[in-house]
């Protein structure tokens, strides 16, 4: 008998109604916020994720399902939804249309993680991307949409809002952080040391 691959799960008829319920709430809420659905391929060229996610992240270094296809191209099962949407936005010239362009997706994503209870290698992600919307009002709208979806699903939600700051502030913060760790590198794990030098 052939068993299901490690880190995956069958959605059986006895529980698929729960998936339909959550997906319906996500879609209906996205519709209320005037978002249109976008569907991108389940796999993309690996280079897209190296650029989009960053070559120093755990996703790229440890968690991607990457393989060579019959044409010897490096292909990756998408580990997240944003990169494929950004590629589609550029490749299909969506920037030439009316702005802001607000899109959502519900898609499977894949991460090569250590499977544990509640942690699988195939996930399903609901995501929102807004192009051409500037300022905090766009961020607030996306946060409100996510909050609404979670509340409609019956979850108790408490929001804590933070900011990465402006590019100047981030640069100063990174410099201060690197300064703090400069004399502690021997105490860091190999991955953290690598990030110290790459970031």
Regions found by a protein language model. Name each.
Residues 1-199:
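Extended, charged alpha-beta segments that form solvent-exposed binding/catalytic grooves
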């Amino acid at each position: 008998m052939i068993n299901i691959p490690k880190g995956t799960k069958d959605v059986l008829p006895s529980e698929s109604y729960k998936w339909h319920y959550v997906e319906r709430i996500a879609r209906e809420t996205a519709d209320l916020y005037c978002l249109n659905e976008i569907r991108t391929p389940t796999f993309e060229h690996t280079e897209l994720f190296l650029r989009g996610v960053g070559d120093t992240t755990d996703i790229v270094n440890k968690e991607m399902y990457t393989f060579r296809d019959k044409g010897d191209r490096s292909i990756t099962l998408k580990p997240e939804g944003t990169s494929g949407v950004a590629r589609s936005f550029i490749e299909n010239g969506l920037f030439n249309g009316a702005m802001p362009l607000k899109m959502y997706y519900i898609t499977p994503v894949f991460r090569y993680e250590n499977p544990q209870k509640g942690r699988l290698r195939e996930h399903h992600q609901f995501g929102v991307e807004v192009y051409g919307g500037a300022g905090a009002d766009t961020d607030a709208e996306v946060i409100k949409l996510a909050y609404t979806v979670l509340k409609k699903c019956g979850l108790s939600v408490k929001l804590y809002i933070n900011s990465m700051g402006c590019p100047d502030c981030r640069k100063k913060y990174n410099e201060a952080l690197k300064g703090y760790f400069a004399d502690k590198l021997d105490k860091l794990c190999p991955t953290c040391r690598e990030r110290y030098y790459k970031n």
